[in-house]
A protein has these predicted regions:
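Helix-to-loop junction immediately C-terminal to a conserved catalytic motif
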Residues: 52
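Conserved ABC transporter NBD signature motif
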Residues: 60-68
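Short coil-to-helix segment of the ABC ATPase nucleotide-binding domain corresponding to the Q-loop/switch region
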Residues: 91-98
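Conserved signature/switch motifs of ABC ATPase nucleotide-binding domains
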Residues: 128, 149
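Conserved ABC ATPase signature
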Residues: 129-133, 137-139
Length: 211
């Protein structure tokens, strides 16, 4: 579970101190997609960076399963999904997932990688190169990679922004099922409110505040 309590983040801009997040509090519940929506510049990306421990708030707390976020917690408990998937062109599909094991200092788990690829609809494609995959397939690789470390939280930064409507809904449906089945919390930044279902949670960000 992700809990952000009274989090404030500011940045220096010349002579001014700008407030990106203004004393925000919210939680992302396991088993649900929590959509984080708002206009450009509203603070969505800053919120996601704070949740991932990629920046330190000026004040407030960020907890994953009641533990303050630091580098160890980020490696052990958080899976990230990006807008462009951030895959390594020289590696095949399976090795994209195994990179996370190397980063975490554990023995590469090829069987787990293949199981996760099957789970996201890419069974038998472990030896394919990135250039042989469609945009939707690449995002499925990104989802499988995010699950390699058995996270309790997934943070997704506009993962459907480069996809058409049909592929976008497929990716969201896949994520929705995965977080329900595995009881994972998921913060999902998007500008596309048509992706949201009645079963999802919604956090609206405007001017650095949430509603």
């Amino acid at each position: 579970m992700l809990t952000m309590d009274n989090v404030t983040v500011t940045f220096q801009d010349g002579q001014e101190r700008l407030t990106a997040l203004d004393n925000i509090s919210f939680s992302a519940t396991p088993g649900h997609l929590t959509f984080i929506v708002g206009e450009s510049g509203s603070g969505k990306s800053t919120l996601l960076s704070a949740a991932a421990g990629l920046l330190t708030p000026d004040s407030g707390t960020v907890l994953i399963d009641d533990t303050p976020v630091d580098t160890r917690v980020r490696l052990e408990k958080i899976g990230m999904i990006f807008q462009q998937a951030n895959l390594i062109g020289a590696l095949n599909v399976r090795d994209q997932l195994l990179v996370t094991d190397h980063i975490r200092g554990v023995k590469p788990r090829k069987e787990r990688a293949d199981e996760l690829l099957a789970t996201v609809g890419l069974e038998g494609l472990g030896d394919r190169k990135m250039q042989q995959l469609s945009g939707g397939q690449r995002q499925r690789v990104g989802i499988a990679r995010a699950l390699m470390g058995e996270p309790s939280l997934i943070l997704a930064d506009e993962p459907t922004a480069a996809l058409d409507s049909e592929r976008s809904h497929e990716i969201v449906a896949l994520l929705r099922n995965l977080v329900q089945e595995r009881n994972i919390a998921c913060g999902f930044v998007t500008h596309d409110t048509e992706l949201i279902s009645s079963s999802d949670e919604v956090v609206r960000v405007a001017d650095g505040q949430v509603t």
